[in-house]
Swiss-Prot record:
Gene3D superfamilies cross-referenced by the UniProt entry: 3.30.160.810, Translation factors (2.40.30.10)
Purpose: One of the primary rRNA binding proteins, it binds directly near the 3'-end of the 23S rRNA, where it nucleates assembly of the 50S subunit.
Upper lineage: Bacteria, Pseudomonadati, Pseudomonadota, Alphaproteobacteria, Hyphomicrobiales
Protein name, per record: Large ribosomal subunit protein uL3
Species of the source: Beijerinckia indica subsp. indica (strain ATCC 9039 / DSM 1715 / NCIMB 8712)
Entry-linked PANTHER family: 50S RIBOSOMAL PROTEIN L3 (PTHR11229), LARGE RIBOSOMAL SUBUNIT PROTEIN UL3C (PTHR11229:SF16)
PTM: Methylated by PrmB.
Length: 240
């Protein structure tokens, strides 16, 4: 089981095939997605990699987090997430995952936070049909109607579909096909829509209901930081 990645949704566009057909795609960007920590069976009871993405200002990072980034020798990150892996696919700390971690044609599962739409009625939130236009109905054409029984059961059951807040929920979309990858710019183009708004964080994993292509690199595609690179600002802040 390989590690997933954290990506930032940039928006949607389309790409054309050789036959002239266009494919709607969502553009996901890997902005310095690095391994910042490990979870091991001996210490934590499970095996996982902790990834970070983005560039956070040192003043906005807590002292404990600055120390964590200093140990990993990476700059402070905006977003952190864990991905369960096997012992054989545990990536080294400091490794930066590149866009060709996923191969063209493979299927991925994406997870994000859906767009918030505020308070919504039952017709928009649950696709209710609404009440009749005439025949005694007035004012309440878009209402949800009855919510329960009479004296028995004498209550409205929990989880009844009613008006309320719509969106801002964790949503996973399965089996989206990778159309293109751009290693230099760190872009992954997946076919179809991805949950969330532009600028939101998206978790991308190998599809659990599809076979992993033989071309997919194991344990993953990444590049290591330069041995002679200068220490990150987080190191100085942690020591101070």
């Amino acid at each position: 089981m390989r590690s997933g990645v954290i990506a930032q949704k940039l928006g949607m566009t389309r790409v054309f095939t050789d036959a002239g057909e266009h494919i709607p795609v969502t553009v996901l960007k890997l902005d310095g997605c690095q391994v910042v920590g490990h979870r091991t069976k001996e210490q934590n009871g499970y095996v996982a990699v902790q990834l970070g993405i983005g560039r956070a200002k040192v003043k906005n990072v807590s002292k404990a987090e600055r120390g964590r980034f200093a140990v990993a020798k990476v700059e402070p990150k905006l977003k952190l997430a864990e991905f369960r892996v096997d012992d054989a696919t545990l990536l080294p700390i400091g490794a930066e995952i590149t866009a060709d971690h996923f191969v063209v044609g493979q299927f991925v599962d994406v997870t994000g936070t859906s767009t918030g739409k505020g308070f919504a009625g039952a017709m928009k939130r649950w696709n209710f049909g609404g009440l009749r236009a005439t025949h005694g109905v007035s004012i309440s054409h878009r209402s949800h109607g009855s919510t329960g029984g009479r004296q028995d059961p004498g209550k409205t059951f929990k989880n009844k579909k009613m008006a309320g807040h719509l969106g801002t929920e964790r949503v996973t979309t399965l089996n989206l096909r990778v159309v293109q990858t751009d290693v230099e710019r760190g872009l992954i183009l997946v076919e179809g829509a991805v949950p969330g708004t532009a600028g939101g964080w998206i978790y991308v994993r190998d599809a659990v209901k599809k076979h992993l292509p033989k071309e997919a690199p194991l344990p993953g595609k990444f590049r290591l930081a330069n041995e002679g690179a200068e220490p990150a600002p987080a190191t100085e802040s942690a020591e101070g």
